[in-house]
Amino acid sequence: MLDKVIIANRGEIALRVLRACRELGIKTVAVHSTADANLKHVLLADESVCIGPPLSAKSYLNMPSIIAAAELTDAAAIHPGYGFLSENADFAERVEQSGFVFIGPKAETIRMMGDKVSAIRIMKEAGVPCVPGSGAPLGLDNDENLRIAKEIGYPVIIKASGGGGGRGMRVVHNAAALLHSINVTRSEALAAFGNDQVYMEKFLEKPRHIEFQVLADHHGNVIHLGERDCSMQRRHQKVIEEAPAPGITSEQREMMGERVVEACRKVGYRSAGTLEFLYQDGEFYFIEMNTRIQVEHPVTELITGIDLVKAQLMIAEIGRAHV
């Protein structure tokens, strides 16, 4: 029984989780840094616990402090929101090992989908179309990497396996720049993500960015809630989301929806998630999966009438959501 939930985040998403909990009759505990003691979600929560100083590394990214807050307040579950520890498999694992419910996917699923190379392999096995690419991390053999790029066809894009949020990517237009770009991306990936593995894909020059929202319970039941168009971006960061996506036919929506549902079943997914695609010349190409609630989730809520955060809570509590 989820009688009390730790909200391990701040700002808008913390208020969003608090509202869903309140409407379901679930008590809330806001964890916060010393700088955030007077934020609205802290003042509105049933309880609050200070977990550290303003620096995120010592508060909102401090796993022991968050778990200790759950123990101190006798909470049943932890909702990570988005950002911070929401896609940290180690955190999800530690939460469950400590006897609490992690409101999100299983740790192994987060780990599996967080590695872009692993995620692409799984999607291919599930019949989801992917961008033509290396299909595996690039090795140190320069001749082999040049061969792979030639086979794919320039321009190509070098991506960090552990990257995300529009970071860890470099477009290469010719063979002369390839090897230097691979080395620079490796170094940046190691510094930013602690993982220097990179892979290569065909660079689509004029794609749209389309993402499909999914919900999955503990019993293998998966539904998709249609797509959002997030093509309007600046520096690979989304600026505007629109749903339904203009120009996507009902046949395309149903076809891709079936594929993403099957892919989620294949990996044993649970909770809310989003599969992201590039769309060009009438074709979809998988690029990554977000194993959390997204900033943009209200766009889907407005066109479906489904409260995604409530659904997350119900899935965590009883294993399924009534939507």
Model segments located where?
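N-terminal beta-alpha lobe that positions the nucleotide/phosphoryl donor
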Residues: 1-275, 279-297, 303
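A short N-terminal helical cap/helix-turn-helix that marks the beginning
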Residues: 315-316
